[in-house]
Amino acid sequence: MSQANSSNQIKNQSPNSPFSNFLADLKSLYPNFRFQPGPRFLFRPPNTIFYEPSNPNDTNNSFQDFALQLLHELGHAISGHRNFQLSIDRIKIETEAWHAAQIILENHPNLQTKYHLFFNQDFAEAHLDTYRRWLHQKTTCKKCGLTMFQDKNQTWYCPHCDLI
């Protein structure tokens, strides 16, 4: 990371920024979880939530986006997500985490008021779409184009090419 980007992130994470204040509020509300800066938003069981520090030059990373992604990772933590066995389970736990994020926000109306936050279903669906596309790519047979299925050993089979 360049020094300019680093100083911009620090400036945007200043003690009075909504990013820092929101993070402090979540730490206070959920003291059993550790919130750490990292290269991306990620929940690492059993209790660490990594967040991508905001960059004021990135217009795609608004405070609303930052807050929703952080609530999503907290949703994983509160839901007790550890890992997934089957690829279809990935979509299930991602959906559960977005639902948990919505519930967290509903249970803390003070966060909604203080930070002018609202749960953006379109934002959540856009993120879920990335997993849906990933699963579609993973399940499409490269030979014939049919949808494959995964067994309990995480092996993929095409109903046409592999089972005939």
Model segments located where?
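Short alpha-helix boundary/capping segments
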Residues: 62, 66, 89-92
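Active-site scaffold of zinc-dependent metalloenzymes
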Residues: 9-16, 23-64, 77-81
